[in-house]
């Protein structure tokens, strides 16, 4: 028998409401509808399938306050993370929502109706209290930033009725609901299951750790990685799942199973560890591995950890009896080359030689294409990582040139395009300011808002090309720092971004203007012209600065090439 669910009953709303499917689906079409965000979708999926048992909906004010203040629902059940549905006053008023109303919850991706919520209450949360009590209050914490920057001012509480399952098109066979996983364990005859939570690729140390934990408890292993929302910058779940699938045959035959969890992590450390334990209990696990700094977001800008290294272990241990799942606390394993084995650090005598590779070092080796030893990770795992993380010489990048009209941006961009094409190895795309204006932004004017929109269009195109491995050269005027920073953020999510300030002076650009556009602007024939009646904000932190008044185009291109070589994007001559 699998572990009983949290609260005693698995709240599988999909199964409960299946007999009323046609009735609920018809009603959902007649109700006002809320479009759910990606986080809402993750939360709703685990509400509907029972992963968040004993919840049957989004928390009302009593449950919310109980969880924030006392780590408990209003009925006394332990629960550590607020599961809330936020909405703006404008949306609430526009849909006419009030206590007692029924509202359809709709998937923003395909407009499918997923559930009907009967509203208990609509309330304004104390976000400051939520940030402090649940996450520790540090304004740099990703969940605190999300709370303040992306969460609407009102929460809507109430129970939901299931209309449809969420559609997934990836790894469908690995997306077990709690009921399905429990049935799977029963079919396999498993009665003791150690669950392992991860949002990272797994290597040999993780395999050793989970096998040790299972053998010590005469149990089997559930590898239960998160494939919903994790920490920004994490390796994508497609790569990670391929890693887990490659690793699975390295376990003793029949010991481990892989299941995917569509969870939106909050990176909430101690509170999140309790939540993770509840979720794994609902999925049938009897044991749960909690490691060092479990579900922590790393360090803040001062280099300080948001939580203590063992705060999460202590939190789960505190509520061990109520949780009804055994906590497996583990020490970090390290490799002993003399005996070719992994051991917990606290069991290694002083003076014994050890080896380890940090996450930073691993990323460096992947970036440079250098050797990753088999003692650290299995060849089949490394192969997957290399396919998804090619060395920089095979990665895309964007060189973004900014400067006045006639500063030399276009000449540098064209010359750089020719130089990169000569080098070969990747496609090269050129996004000149005039070309983009004609092809992508013909309807835009030159107001600050339209200029910003134009730069964001360039950034979107550049990001997609960069993601596909191209070298992108963009050369708009881009006069505003805010627009350039947003372009950097957009493109950096897909690859590496280099900002080149073409710092040719306004006087020189105007003096050498053969097209006469500056003269026309001075006469008032062109309005909103950068440098004449519209400002150019000097870049604060360019990656490189060139000046055609003081150097040749060839020299400027050479500086950019040297920068690309130094960062590993081009092979050194």
UniProtKB/Swiss-Prot annotation:
Pathway: Sulfur metabolism; hydrogen sulfide biosynthesis; sulfite from sulfate: step 1/3. GO terms for cellular component: cytoplasm. Its EC number is 2.7.7.4. Residues 395-573 are annotated as: Allosteric regulation domain. The keyword Ribonucleoprotein does not apply. SUPFAM superfamilies: Nucleotidylyl transferase, P-loop containing nucleoside triphosphate hydrolases, PUA domain-like. CDD domains: APSK (cd02027), ATPS (cd00517). Allosterically inhibited by 3'-phosphoadenosine 5'-phosphosulfate (PAPS). The active site is at 198, 199, 200. Keywords: Allosteric enzyme, Amino-acid biosynthesis, ATP-binding, Cysteine biosynthesis, Cytoplasm, Methionine biosynthesis, Nucleotide-binding, Nucleotidyltransferase, Transferase. The record marks 203, 206 as: Transition state stabilizer. ATP binds at residues 197-200, 291-294, 333. 3'-phosphoadenylyl sulfate binds at residues 434-437, 451, 477-478, 515. GO terms for biological process: cysteine biosynthetic process; hydrogen sulfide biosynthetic process; methionine biosynthetic process; sulfate assimilation via adenylyl sulfate reduction; sulfate assimilation, phosphoadenylyl sulfate reduction by phosphoadenylyl-sulfate reductase (thioredoxin). It holds the Pfam family APS_kinase. Catalyzes the first intracellular reaction of sulfate assimilation, forming adenosine-5'-phosphosulfate (APS) from inorganic sulfate and ATP. Plays an important role in sulfate activation as a component of the biosynthesis pathway of sulfur-containing amino acids. In the N-terminal section; belongs to the sulfate adenylyltransferase family. In the C-terminal section; belongs to the APS kinase family. The adenylyl-sulfate kinase (APS kinase) is non-functional. It is involved in allosteric regulation by PAPS. PAPS binding induces a large rotational rearrangement of domains lowering the substrate affinity of the enzyme. This is Sulfate adenylyltransferase. It comes from Coccidioides immitis (strain RS). The lineage of its organism: Eukaryota, Fungi, Dikarya, Ascomycota, Pezizomycotina. The gene is MET3.
